[in-house]
């Protein structure tokens, strides 16, 4: 009898401890799973909630096909920039130059249109891609801080846009009838081409991030660059490509803005880099890098533009209210991300 009580066989005291450990493990796993889902889909949940509430409050003024198409069109320009920013932030970087690149692209597109549609398209994309490439080389090869490099190119690109437009006093116009205007004013099946182009870029970005070695490398570098180096990943090449893509997409957004308005102004795009960063982070991408998604960025972009649309529906609120709301959202999201990350580590 004493042997049965003191042994480790059946009926011994070890069994309840093992069961308790299994239960705790299951609870922890469930908590991690819920935290992960909230981190990835939080922006989508908030977006759906805002759309439902706005539809109830404003009725057909908000919940109409025309209004939703307007929201999509307004989202397309920011969305293009945000896709590039998603890769940069997941890769552990930051790009402050995109707003100025958009303005420079719009000015160059309108300026180049006097030489034909081909120049109007090629010139802004080439220049913005070149500046993005310069960002990547200085950051990856010269090992300069991304904040400093892209801040410098922010100033450079904005200054160049003002120089081309005679210190902002000259606004270049695209002549009606040029093929380039179709990029901003044309439509496909009733949907504006900027929306179609942005959708294609989002799809390509999603495939690149989730279905390619390049996307795996970007995530690995942003998560732990030293470990990525030990894995033999081409860190410098991946980083250069990230900033090149960001520059090209900012240039594409500026080109579409110019084609949409048939003009290029050096004053547009101020603060766009902050809106893009906010959309990316609100969409669940960690500002510290290593985790994020294109789908989340899409939800973040749409959420910001839906909020802006709701503010316009109210009519009595200023345009700056959207910036206040975006700032509050950003702080809340970052706090939630920190909490969820801690939950996943427990």
Feature annotation, model-predicted:
Residues 49-115, 137-144, 280-294, 328:
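Single transmembrane alpha-helix segments in multi-pass membrane proteins
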Residues 40-45, 71, 78-79, 100-101, ...:
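Hydrophobic alpha-helical transmembrane segments
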Residues 43-56, 85, 157-161, 197-206, ...:
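Hydrophobic core segments of alpha-helical transmembrane domains in multi-pass membrane transport
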Residues 1-53, 203-204, 223, 230-237, ...:
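Cytosolic-side transmembrane-helix boundaries in multi-pass membrane proteins
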Residues 115-118, 122-124, 130-135, 139, ...:
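Helix-loop-helix "hairpin" substructures at the membrane interface of multi-pass membrane proteins
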